[in-house]
């Protein structure tokens, strides 16, 4: 079985590190990349086309919900 491709977008370094570590321990997931803001996250998501997204709701440039609205027609 193929691994689930995962992308994390979060501006909190601790949350990003902890979630990345937990995903790294689980053989079902492949962490394809991380981004620290919505703008970079959008580029990464469009490139990777992940199976699973972890998005921070509150980020300085764009909320997780705004990011979802921008990518929903492309992934």
Briefly describe each language-model feature range:
Residues 3-14, 19-23:
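Conserved acidic segment of CheY-like receiver
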Residues 46-48, 70-75:
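Conserved phosphotransfer cores of two-component systems
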Residues 17, 42-43, 69:
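Alpha-helical elements of the RecA-like P-loop NTPase motor core of helicases
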Residues 37-40, 63-66:
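Acidic catalytic/metal-coordinating carboxylates
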Residues 28-36, 44:
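Short hydrophobic/Thr-rich beta-strand motif most characteristic of the beta2 strand and flanking loop
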Residues 9-10, 35, 53:
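Conserved sequence signature across two-component system core domains
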Residues 57-59:
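Receiver (REC) domain active-site loop signature in two-component systems and cognate sites
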Residues 48-54:
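Active-site beta3 strand of CheY-like receiver
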